[in-house]
Amino acid sequence: MIGGTRSPKVSVVVPTHDSGPHIEKLVASLLRQSLPAAEFEAVFVDDGSTDGTPARLAELAAAHPHFRVLRIENSGWPSRPRNLGVAHARGEYVLFADDDDWLGDEALERLHDCARTHDADVVVGRMAGHGRSVPRELFRRNRFDATLANSPLIDSLTCHKMFRRAFLDEHGLRFPEGPLRRLEDHRMVVRSYFLSRRTCVLSDYTCYHHARRGDAGNVTATRLDPAEYYASLREALDIVDAHTEPGPLRDRLHRRWLRNEMLNRVRGRRMLDAPEEWLAQVVREIQGVIRERFAPGVAAGLPPLQRVLAHLAEQGRVADLRRLAEWETGVRAAGTVDRHEVAGTALTVTVSARLESAGRPVTFAADGDRDLLVLPVDDLDPVLRDMTAALGRSRLDVVARRRETSEEVLLPVTSDTRWVPGPAGERHLVHHAVATVDGAALDAGTWSLKARVTCAGWTEDTRLPLVLRPAGDGAAPAVEDERALWTRLRRAVRRRIGRR
């Protein structure tokens, strides 16, 4: 109870710095929360803003008793404001939010209910990305006893979660404030996963909207210093090593940083747009981490494209990385709707999809009983390009995406993957899936369908021509086939031209 004797259920801790109008979505979402205002507080910690942010926060605190504002001299990074927010928080649970993100309207109520129902120390709510990538596989289903060993929990290392405040205090879990500032949330969150008595993943509601500011104005959007960044990454690896023994689990956890923070920086458009001198520094740092910190099983467990990237980076072959990046910019998923039917409120759709490069299928060459990914780089050990182990992890998902909010729902599918021979002895993979969606269970809005191909080291989306428009009242949704719309438009254009 704010201003009374009872502590609030939740404290939302928000670091701010020159937030400007970007904070308004978060503020509006806090004011829309289904959890009563008397049962939560928002603790804004302003990190030395030089614009109108302090005045706006003071205005909000004056109007809303459950909003509190603290001001500090500029520290230059979110760690200190977050830590100060925790020190002043009064809630049973703490949720960290950034000033340019926002919450789902029922986020606090649902996350707190989940935490109390399952006596959880940590609750991870489903996220939607707006110009930012967010975990996907983790949110395929609810998980009420998730661990780093039994789930892809390691895919979610941002701090935008709900933590039991007593748990944070018991273990001294705070964000590092030392000279190594990058990946501060990784180091705090991965420790919390190891120490948590129970961690839940709430996947049936979009709790958090993670956005990239159009002006790239927040501090984490600045170009990283490679030496500082990878020194911070090494500290995250130290935490993993302190809680695991050498072996498959440690390799799998290390693999997350190799894949996301290392290889993703030296592939595709991201690499081609980077300054050459800076990129050379990044590759040198990656090379050092791979050689000094990773067991052979870390890279060996990757799919073939990423194994090749790891090998090229470890060898310092920047020219070959660039050649591969130029080719990879042409890789896309191509999908078709083979059939669809509506029965009652349910839509069943049959989809086929494959990976293409410049309009031609991504191919594999036979090598005895192996199929090797064909890449535009020479002098590669066939083991690096071998698709055998990764074939079972290839799949086709069908995703419903709400246009108004960018939230995504992975639909239940039955799927299979088949080899298709080519004219010159090569072959490629075609993925098939049958998905069913109950339109009556979707929130009101416009939902697009897309196919998501995961294969050989790529995860690529392609839009499908079906759109659902549920009203949110439990009735059957309208289903539009955009192919039919375009056919009608083409016919209308031809008729109009024919009259001239």
Can you say where each PLM-predicted feature lies in the sequence?
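Catalytic core of nucleotide-sugar-dependent glycosyltransferases
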Residues: 205-213, 219-247, 261-262, 272-292
